[in-house]
Amino acid sequence: AELPFDTSFLQAFEGREGQTEHPILLCTVGRFSYPKAIDRAVYICRQLVQQSIDVCWYVVGYGGDELLIRKAIAETGMEKHFVLVGKQINPYPYIKACDIYVQPSRYEGKAVTVREAQILGKSVAITRFPTSSSQLEEGVDGIIIPNNAEGAAEGLAQFIADKQQQEAIKEQLRIRHYGNEKEVDKIYSAIEG
């Protein structure tokens, strides 16, 4: 399918270890800060790659932890699997293009991007934190994975392998209404440009 935005960032994934024709595209949108745990997501990604799962994880955002995250990417050798896209005025096409939206936060209030990903019909995986059960209905419109690198990688690997669960969640997302239809229309308008 042709994507309605600049996909040149996907070239960064070329030549990755265990490359397949159809990699799993993971997306995260968020501030590069300690609570959002983008630095830890690099290690989650490495564990998935070590399990021979062909993932391409791209992150839309910016923030004070960018150097820390870039250092983690270099130290783990994940340059071909974990890419920082940078700040984008319109993150919706990036969310729409992924297979699974991942919110790897250490803690979170209410992640608006999780709801936006659900509105866009994306399977969602979030880490367990005090308010995570208010974000989604576990196993129905997303999954909650452990809030540590090893457990999150294990939970994400199981979810990636379980295509039936992903499809069941996507079906739930199609039939649920997450709020104001005008907001949904705005998101689709933003995607279409």
Label each residue range with its predicted role:
Residues G18-K36, V42-C45:
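Conserved donor-binding/catalytic core segment of Leloir-type glycosyltransferases
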Residues R70-G86:
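Nucleotide-activated donor-binding/catalytic signature segment of Leloir-type glycosyltransferases, i.e.
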Residues K87, R106:
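Aromatic "clamp/platform" in nucleotide-sugar-dependent glycosyltransferases that forms part
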Residues E116, F129-G139, I143-I144:
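Short acidic/histidine- and often glycine-rich active-site loop of Leloir-type glycosyltransferases
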Residues S123-T127:
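Short hydrophobic beta-strand element within catalytic cores of glycosyltransferases
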Residues E138-G139, I143-A149, Q158-K163:
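Conserved acidic donor-binding segment of nucleotide-sugar-dependent glycosyltransferases
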Residues N147, Q164-E192:
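A charged, aromatic-enriched C-terminal amphipathic alpha-helix characteristic of glycosyltransferases
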